[in-house]
């Protein structure tokens, strides 16, 4: 019984210790040309938070094929990290204020038209902080 009570109270203890998480998502972008970087809308907490980011979970969804050479970065106001794949985790933002918004930056190197265009259906992050 004590074990279950402890498990039930853990989220409250974590909250009291200043730990938490926020989630945000947005619709994606359409990238029609190589050599041009496009940014998602800022993904930010819906309520004020305090603390420093720890583990960040990302996810994005494409409509259609992934262009060869696609580069995707996840950026705060103070730093960026390259991400690989449509979902994953990173600790690259450890120490960044949890209130800072994040953005996905999309780019396919080269020049000329991108056929078919890169269509990002959605972007999302879950930011854990303490």
PLM feature spans:
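Disulfide-rich extracellular domains of secreted proteins
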Residues: 16-130
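Short, intrinsically disordered low-complexity segments
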Residues: 1-2, 72
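Sec-dependent N-terminal signal peptides
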Residues: 3-13
């Amino acid at each position: 019984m004590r074990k279950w009570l402890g498990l039930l109270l853990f989220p409250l203890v974590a909250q009291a210790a200043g730990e938490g998480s926020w989630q945000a998502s947005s619709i994606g972008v359409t990238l029609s040309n190589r050599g041009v970087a496009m940014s998602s809308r800022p993904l930010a907490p819906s309520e004020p938070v305090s603390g420093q980011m720890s583990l960040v979970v990302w996810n994005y969804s494409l409509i259609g094929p992934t262009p060869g050479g696609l580069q995707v970065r996840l950026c705060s106001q103070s730093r960026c990290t390259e991400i690989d794949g449509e979902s994953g985790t990173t600790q690259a933002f450890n120490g960044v204020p949890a209130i800072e918004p994040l953005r996905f930056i999309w780019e396919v190197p080269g020049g000329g038209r991108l056929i078919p265009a890169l269509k990002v259906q959605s972007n999302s992050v879950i930011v854990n902080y303490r």
